[in-house]
Amino acid sequence: SVPNEEVQQIAQQLTGQGVSRQALGLATRVLDVDARLPDPRILEVHPELSFQRMAGEVLPSKKSARGVARRISSLAQAMTDVDVVAALETCPADVPIDDSLDAFATLWTARRHADGRSEGILASPEIDSRGTAMQMTV
């Protein structure tokens, strides 16, 4: 692990800007997952791709009321065994709605994978040096 001060100094030299706390936290988690690969239980999922597959189209911005409504509707139709609205009401108040919806979309993809219905978005994904397919799953 590289100390925060060193990361900030290198980023400042290379880009003229520092690195956000969020980016540093995310990088730590990505490196942790990368160290565990290859592990067939770990999938690469992008919530927007999951929502696109659920809805059959690209949805409006997740930062807009229309986009939030469409995501809730898509989740409710795709996961009929879950009361999505009731589940969202149990989320901590400080968690942004778009983060909660993204977590649900990731859950939808994980369930599809567990049921053998998930699919990669690329016909021929690149394979990394460890033999892991570089592939988003929906």
Regions found by a protein language model. Give the residues of each.
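RNase H-like (RuvC/DEDD) metal-dependent nuclease/polynucleotide-processing core
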Residues: 1-138
